[in-house]
Amino acid sequence: MSRVAKAPVTVPNGVTVTQNGRQVEVKGSKGTLSFNLHALVELKQEEGKLQLAPAKESKDAWMQAGTARAVLNNLVKGVSEGFERKLQLVGVGYKAVVKGTVVNLNLGYSHPIDYALPEGVTAETPTATEIILKSANKQLLGQVAAEIRAYRSPEPYKGKGVRYSDEVILRKEAKKK
């Protein structure tokens, strides 16, 4: 039995949740997001709260209800507050420049990398070695951050590469003669 599914999702003022069959749509100041409920999950709306419950008592239904509750909570938080992810570029000559919806990355290769941001994600560079990504969609934001990091993931000897700001790189010692 999922403990996550038992907790209600609180809906702040300015956020509306509409359900059309299995489709759930969440609207707020930061945008509109939607997702499909699993067939084993039911959604009940009360004043300022959303309660998810399994359609039938089974282990799989409780698991799906817990997952749906977590996704719905992220949608509500995303359209009301939004999410952000910070990336750091560590290395000589590594820099980033944002031009509209394109992030131009110089990561030590012989050519610059132009990464086109998907719709719903914005980027800014307060310094040349820092990228701040913002979005209402937590899943899309994490995907974009992972794709940018994959161009030059941090190596364990000098720590050079693109890393998340809260990431700790385990360093190795160089081989000695």
Swiss-Prot record:
GO terms for biological process: cytoplasmic translation. Belongs to the universal ribosomal protein uL6 family. Part of the 50S ribosomal subunit. Coiled coil: none annotated. Gene3D superfamilies: Ribosomal protein L6, alpha-beta domain. InterPro entries: Ribosomal_uL6-like, Ribosomal_uL6-like_a/b-dom_sf, Ribosomal_uL6_a/b-dom, Ribosomal_uL6_bac-type, Ribosomal_uL6_CS. The keyword Transmembrane helix does not apply. This is Large ribosomal subunit protein uL6. Keywords: Ribonucleoprotein, Ribosomal protein, RNA-binding, rRNA-binding. Pfam families: Ribosomal_L6 (PF00347). Disulfide bonds: none annotated. GO terms for cellular component: cytosolic large ribosomal subunit. GO terms for molecular function: rRNA binding; structural constituent of ribosome. PANTHER family: 60S/50S RIBOSOMAL PROTEIN L6/L9, LARGE RIBOSOMAL SUBUNIT PROTEIN UL6M. This protein binds to the 23S rRNA, and is important in its secondary structure. It is located near the subunit interface in the base of the L7/L12 stalk, and near the tRNA binding site of the peptidyltransferase center.
